[in-house]
Structure formats: C-alpha cells, structure tokens
Amino acid sequence: DFISSDDPTAWRSGDVLAYDRYIKAYDFYAGLGLYSVDGSGLPIMVCVSYCDFNGLPVDNAGYCGIKYGWAIFGASDVNYFSEAVDVVGHEFTHGVTSSSAVGNYYANASGAINEAYSDIMGNLCEMMGGYTSDTEWLVGENSGYIFRSMSSPMDYKQPVKLGGTYYMPPTDTPSPEENDLGGVHQNSSLLAQMAYILYKAGMSLDEERSLWLTSIELLTPTVGYKEVHAALLMSVDINGLDARYKDVLTEAFRAADMI
C-alpha cells in the first residue's frame, strides 16, 4: 500500500533526501531527452529501509531492476549513500545501461565496464548540477564514504592498467562474495579513469555527458574494452567533438593495455 501525508514533518529526512536525489538523476537524463531508465517515462519507485530477503538491512544502494512496470531502487537505513547525488546517479545509470544494451553480462570485463559507466555518469550528474565541490572525480564523497577515485584509482586500491597492480583477473566462476564477480567494482577504474583523462585534456562536462551517453547506445551485453574504445571514437564523431579527443582516448587506452 502507498502511504500519503499532508504533514511536511511526517517524513524521515533521509527518505526525503533519497527521493530528491532520484529526481535530480531523472532530470539529468531528461535534459538529454531520455526520460526514466527506459527513455520512455517508466515510473520509478524508491524503496526506503532497503532489506534483503531475510529482512536484514542492506548496507548499500541499489538498482533492483524493473518489476511490475516500475523501475525499482533501494535506499538503506544503515548508510547515507542515497543522500549523495553521484551514488544515486550511479544506480540510475545501471537502469539506463540495462535498458540501452538490452541487458549486461554482469561479470568480468563487461561488468567492470558497466560499473565504470555508472561511476562516470553519476559523477557528471553531480558535477553538472553543482552538488559537489569535488574536482578529482571521487565517488561517494558526500555520502560519508569515498568508494573510488577516477583521478587516482590506486589511492583506493584499484588498477590503472589491465593486469597491473590491484587488477582482479577474470573468472569462470563469478561470485559477488569470493571474487567481486570477476572484479566488476575492482576493475571499474580501468575505463572510469578515461573520463578524468578527457576532462584534464579539456573536454567540458557537457561534452563528456554527450560522449558517454551516446557510446552507451553502441554497447552490447558482453562488450569488451576494444569495443568500448571503438564506441567512444565513434561517439566523438557523432557528437561533432574535437577530433583530437580520439587521439587522447587511444593513447590512454594503450597506456592502460586495454587495446
């Protein structure tokens, strides 16, 4: 059942903040003509007091998929993650990539690529809206816990090179508990760092938003790094961006041993 109230003091502040953050994420994509996660105005439900099947609080924020005609998101009582625009934008982007790529093989490289897109678009949502003073492309700096850094991944024990320090190799038996599903979060920095590299090379936030969103539409469920590189080069052309960014991307991908 849905509960309503005319009393503005009847709602918990954390729940209201989570609601507000999802509005901001929705508006971020709507500014590009993409309404909701499916691009066609699918209604959104933010479930507060996010729990697992045993009724225990989930110490995370989450995109739970499309259920009964709703895009479902979870906001927990045991953290402040859903009060941070970049974290909420991250989760919202999971819905966008799931719809755009007709699913995603969420493990190994393709899963890490999925996570990178969420970090990138979540940060762009936060920075373009003026909801942070961060210029180092941190993830979660306003949630009470910094998850990752796109400018200095190794500061948070993430790799900057395929097969390098902190890199988690792919696995035939992906498990969220044992190997992070083949490093979907651990290795997300490999692609996510490219957004910061482009930013330092002079690409504006508005140009980044167009670049990355267009490239999402070119991905497949089992995409690899070479395919993402090709999609980004194509996106530079599609969006009429300075051709020198293709050289920046190619140099950065090669430095990371991704092509």
Tell me the role of every PLM-derived stretch.
Residues 1-189, 194-197, 251:
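Extracellular zinc-dependent metalloprotease catalytic-domain scaffold
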Residues 35-40, 203, 239-244:
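Short amphipathic alpha-helical segments with coiled-coil-like heptad repeat character
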Residues 197-208:
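Long hydrophobic segments that form regular secondary structure
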Residues 201, 217-222:
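Hydrolase catalytic cores
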Residues 209-210, 225, 229:
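Extended acidic/polar alpha-helical scaffold segments
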Residues 212-216:
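Long, well-ordered core segments of solenoidal/helical folds
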Residues 227-259:
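Beta/coil-rich, acidic/histidine-enriched accessory regions frequently appended to metallopeptidases
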